[in-house]
Structure formats: structure tokens, C-alpha cells
Amino acid sequence: MKYVDVILPLPLDGTFTYSVPDGMEGKVVPGVRLLVPLGKSKKYIAMATRLHDDKPAFSCKPVEAVLDNTPSLLPQQMRLWQWIGYYYMAPLGDVYNAAMPGGLKSTEKFKPKMELYVELASTYRSEQALHVALNLVQRALKQAKTLTTFLRLSHWDSLDGDTPREGIKKVTKEELMNESHCTAAVVKALIDRGILFTYELEIGRLNTNGESHLDLIKPLSLAQQDAYNGILMQMMKKDVVLLHGVTSSGKTEIYIHLIRKAIEEHKQVLYLLPEIALTVQIMERLHRVFGDRLGIYHSKYSDAERVEIWQKQLSDHPYDVILGARSAVFLPFKNLGLVIIDEEHETSFKQQDPAPRYHARSAAIVLAKMYGAKTLLGTATPSMESYYNAQQGKYGLVELKTRYKGIQLPEIQVVDVKDLRRRKMMSGPFSPQLLAAVREALKNGQQAILFQNRRGFAPMVECKVCGWVPKCKNCDVSLTLHKSINLLTCHYCGYTYPVPTECPNCGSTEIMGRGFGTEKIEDQIAEIFPEAKIARMDLDTTRTRNAYERLIADFSEGRTNLLIGTQMVSKGLDFDKVSVVGILNADSMLNYPDFRAYEHAFMMMAQVSGRAGRKGKRGLVILQTKNPTFPVIGQVVNNDYEGLYQGILEERRTFHYPPFFHLINVYVKHKYDKVCEQASHELSKTLRSWFGERVLGPDKPAVARVKTMNIRKIVIKLENGIDQQKVREYLKFAQQQMGKDPRYGALQIYYDVDPL
């Protein structure tokens, strides 16, 4: 009797063992999907990991069905799953859920997309027979028109002789009805007469149009060519290379040349981007060159589309290039040769909730090593960890310090809004300098971007009389006003509340919004510039793939000229006519209780500033702050990444933070705050007995209650070189001991490794 270990798509650690019935031996191999029972009535699609003869001590159920003829998961993918589960301390079931499209985990069989086609019956496929068919319908005018339309579309009308030729074109039923302006009943009448018949064809959901045109790749500038050569030299010595290039230096063109080289060597390429918005712009550039060799993969695609991409990657003709967001790292590759991680510093590469809380950059580097492939990290503002690795010689380093075609870096003008408010010179959140710059840009047919890293209308509402602030009943946060839907919304659990008309505390009707979100910015700027064509880019306006594409296309083509947005607008988007960028509130990024606050603030401001001044003209950035003397403000103005790096590095060394130490956040959750407090103290005491002063806490996080669950956080700081396996064994053991305590039956403990 053979047995198979499987992963179930449930938040359960480890594998489960099933017996393999005699009739399935040979079909059950690692990587195939199996239908297995669990409990009395549940059935799941499990992933086979290991086939063996080791009879378990318990009675195990048999596999019910093998769903694949060939594996849906390649060996390297399985190893990546196992690494993610181990390193990020996540159940393998959670990794399975994150990795595979829903259609491959569902017990309902995936249905390929079908199209109904119309064809001429074999009886009427000669010139003489066609005349007979036309005579049959000559008095039924709609049928006659539909038949002649079909003959024209399919090219049957241009045939002579009795033998059909290669020139016959397939015609869909929908196309025929649209062209002949007929109903389905008319087509049915022709079918009933035996003149036409219909058949189904699998057409797929993927765009397969477009040949590759590698000859369209633009030649590199001298600076780009030097960087390209430098990357190839470094890749001869290092597995990972960091390309540190200023904004608008033409990094994407270098990537395209590297992709071409990989394709010519018959290798596949994985190109990761942090935001779906970015894939829209870069997709157009890559598609012009690589055509249907390019596949796109991200969460805004339908589940069926993602299944088809997955299956194509397993076929004999996979995509040469995959462009995608974080989840694309899980796709199958048969011959991966190059991984490109653009904007490698971006925090959106890190999955937060649910588990696995993996970092796509780290996972992609590990995946590349499994294939013997090379990894290129590209950014204008490297993460501290990547730059440190490059400085230490772990990664190769190539720098590109000039903008493409000599475009100057933007002029950054710092505006002290505290002084302007005192002199009553501010118009809401807008300084006179910013309004003047936007006015000038619009007058000259240019575009402007306003950056405010807070969506909604107002971050909170408050009673002007007693100071009452409405809070979420499920979470420990104030509610955000969304004026367009006239609701208060919790950005943590999604719960919505009606806007109160009077204060429940004092009865006052003076309830006002406080602060500025992107929605309020949009309202106020529209009053100041009524002639402007304004668009807003935030989570609320980009929930669908089409919404992203429409926003970016409208701004690229000049149908809108003023873009207001959150951090989405900072991420590598390339707009030719943007001459002004306004950073409305730099302080909101700096005054954050996190050791990475300055690093993230610098990156955000440097990146959004880089959107200004693209072709032929130096851009202008208006940076509004109450603290113009903050060192990081000067570093942004002078584009002084090195100064930021050196300043922060010493602090990190002193206070035991990355890149010198690894962090693991241990979270404890429970419905009752008292139980959560007690359990977290008990857990931290156990951890302190092993790790000593490396353990901090427990403390309440910034938001200590989410979705009715109370939270405590324990931080463990681990020096580089510590035995990672021992650390994980200790943590798992402590968690198991807590699980055995009857007081903590409903307690949740989970981990965030290398938190951002």
C-alpha cells in the first residue's frame, strides 16, 4: 500500500497522510491535485507533496480522485512553498491558499471559456449548392441577408470550384448577429433549414494577439549602456545585483535589454512590480516589444484568467516573460533565468494579512537561486537592507546617476505651512506657492500631481462643542468620513456607519470633519480651479482593473490634467507633461511611531518628486511642512540618499534594528482584553527565559483592537548569524505550550518575520 502526504488549503501546519488506492498508483505523484475527504462530510482539493510506503500509526482515509494528468506544481514551487512556510512561520495551508488561483483549489471543475461559432453545412460547400441555399431563403429576407453576411465574413462567397480552400475564416455567432443586425431566431431558422450549424471552441481568456518585435527595442544611451554592461559584469560574480538609478534615468529600458538577452538564451523572465497601477503603463511598453511572449498576472485579473495563465506556464509553450505584482512569484516556471524586482524598496511587496506574511523580494531571490537564475533589484531609493547588502559585497551594485536625455532633477521648494497659517495665508491645505505653481502649469497646458497619503474626505469627524469622536465598534480607531457615499468607514474592518446628525454625548449638531483626505482635496481644488479636469487615484477609485487603466490612460493622454492621489501616485508612473508636484503634508509621514519612519518618508517624497519634469523641462516640487529644518527634508531637497543612509545606519546599529538585527513580531489575539494581556505577559516571560534582553514587550500596538479582537505585540530582536532553526523551534514550542493551557483555548498567536 502506498501513502501520500498532502497540503490542505486550510490554515493548518504540516502535511496530512492519505492512502493511495491500487487503481491510482502511478497517477499520484508530487505536485498533482487530489480530491480528499476530511472529517465526516468535507472534501478538499489537496496538493500531493510526497509518495511513500511508511504506514502511519493511525487509520488514514483513501484519496478519492486524482485531478491532474501532470503536476500542477513544479518541484521548485514546492520548495518555495516550504521555504516561505518555514521562514515566515506560516502554516503550509496558508501558503497553498496564497499561491494557487481559486479555480485550482475548488472542487468544481474549472471551465475553459468557450465561444459559439457558425459554419456552413457540408451539403452546401460547392458553388452550385450555395446557389441552391440562396434560392431557398430568397423570400425570407432576414435569413437571406444573414446568410449572405455569413458568406462574406467567412470568405465562402469568394470560392470557386467544389473544393474548400485554406482561406475560410471562422465566424462567431455573435459576430454574425452583430454584422447582419439579426436576432438569434434568424440564425436558428438557417440552422433548422440545414444550411448552417453551430459548434463550440475553447478560446481562452488571455490576450494572445501581437507578435514580438525585438527589433523595436530602443538603443541605450551611453550612461544606460554603461549600467547595462556593469550589471552583466556584476552578474558574473553575484547572484543579486542592485541597480541604484535616479528617477527618470531609464531603468525600464535597461530591463528590456536584459529581458531580450534572456529570451535569446531561451530563458524565462519574472518581472515584479509593487503596484498593479504600474503594470498598466509598463505592460504597454513591454507588449510593443515582446507581444504574446508577455503574460500579465495580478490580483485584479479574474480567477479564471489566473488559472489559464497558470496552466499556460505548465504547457509546452509558456510565456517567456511574466509581468506581475507580488503573487506572480508563485507561478510555475520551467526555465527561469532572470528575476527583475522594480521599485524594490516598496513596502507593498510585503504581504500583511492574511498569512503568509511573506516579502515578495525575498521570496523571488530564493526562487531565482533554486533555478540558478540571477536577480536584479532596481530603485531610485534602495531599502536600507538592500543597500547595506550591496555595500557589504553580498550584492553587486551598479549606479545610474543621470536622468535620461539630460533631464534635470526637479527643483524642490520647501514651504513652511506653520508660518503661513499664523499669517492666515493658507487656503485650506494649499499654500499660495502651490496654488500659483498649479495655476501656471494648467495655463501652459501642463499637468500637476497633488500627493496626500490619506484617502477619504476627512480622517476623522469631531463634535466642535465637547470633542466627541466616533469610533468603530469593532476596532480601536476613529472613523473616516467618505463624503461621496455619505458614510463613516473603518479602514481596518470595512464596517460603515451613517454620519451622525447630532452628538450622542452632548446633543450638539456641530459635527465637523477634521483633517484632509484625498476626497476633500479633490473637492477643494475643484472650487479653486473649476476649469481643471481632475482625477483621484486612491484605493476607493481603483478597486477594479478597468478603473486603474482608465485613470492612467486619461492622465497619460491629457484627458485629465490634475491628479490627486495617495502613495499610488509615487510608484514609478511616467507622465510626460507633469511639471508640478505638490506634497501637501510631509509631517504625516515623519510623525509616525516607527523606526523606519524617516526611511519611508524619504522614499515616498523622493519618489513622488521624481514624477515632476519628464521631457524638456525641469519640474517643480512644492513640499509643504511644519518642520522645514528636519534633516530628512534637506536630504529630500538635495536627493542625498547617501546622507540618509549613513545617518540612519548608526542609529540602527546602536538600537539593534535591521540591517544589523532581524526582527520577529509575535502577535497575541483574544476576544477578551484581560485574557490577551495575561497570555501575552506569560508568553513574553517564557521567550525572555530563552532569548533574554532580545525580547521587548508585550505592548499594545498602535491599533490594539481590530475586528473585535484585542491585540498585544512582542518584539524579538535577533542578531545576524543566530541559529534561525533554533529560534523557530523555541517559538513553536512556546506556542504549543500556550495552546495546551485551558485558559487560552481561543487564543491566537501568529508571527510577522522581518516586519515593515
Residue ranges: model-predicted function:
Residues 215-221, 225, 237-677, 685, ...:
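Inter-lobe coupling/hinge segments of SF2-like helicase ATPases
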Residues 12, 455, 708:
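A short catalytic or substrate-binding loop motif that flags glycine-/basic-rich loops and adjacent residues
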Residues 685-710, 749:
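A carboxyl-terminal module marker
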Residues 14-16, 172, 662-664, 710-712:
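Short amphipathic alpha-helical segments
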Residues 50-52, 100, 200-202, 452-454, ...:
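A general secondary-structure junction signal
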Residues 118, 412, 479, 511, ...:
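Generic structural motif
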Residues 1-379, 391-407, 690, 724-756:
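Accessory, non-ATPase domains that flank or precede helicase/AAA+ motor cores in DNA-metabolism machines
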